[in-house]
Amino acid sequence: RKDYEKMIQLEPLLEVSHWRLGITYFYLGLFKKAAHQFEIYHQHDAVDRENGIWRFMSQVQQSGVVEARQNLIKYKQSDRPPYPWLYDLFKGEIQPPVLFARIHQAKYPKAYHSRVLFHAYLYVGIYLEMVEGKITEAEKHLAQAVSNEYGRTTGTYMWQVARIHYQQIQKHARINLPR
């Protein structure tokens, strides 16, 4: 967090494009700051529904699902798969089986299919945990994200997020903390 904030202090123009800081705030429990970071990122990239999902998740922690859904960012342009479908999921318009059916029906090339599934498993897992309270199902999807070939072999920032979120959900499940 401090390194990201220092980057922005040294180069203020970086603030609007700094989605990583928003995710950092989210995992530190600074949900208002996280939501704000995702709001200003939208000025930088008005297509990226992944950003809108993080804003939604931050707002859920502050004010609940109903209010967060009422405040979802409106997108006008298309986005990369699976984000339009994931956004529909977070809006409450589809369920995970429909999302996965759409991915499989798209018949993407193998490597791209793996990439799309990684993102779907990650966000469906978080959705099931956060919105539906289905911890066991969430854990299974997060495990699939972590073991996904694309995620494992690229080691991207989002794969690290998946790994950390999966570890957190496992920890809570083991010691049976209320969620």
Language-model regions: role of each:
Residues L10, H44-D45, S78, H113, ...:
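Structural marker of alpha-solenoid helical repeat scaffolds
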Residues Y27, Q61, M130-V131, H165-Q168, ...:
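Register position in tetratricopeptide repeats
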Residues K2, G29, S63, E132-G133:
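Residue-level detector of the short coil/turn that links helix A to helix B
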Residues K6-M7, I40-Y41, Y75, A145:
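Canonical positions in the second alpha-helix
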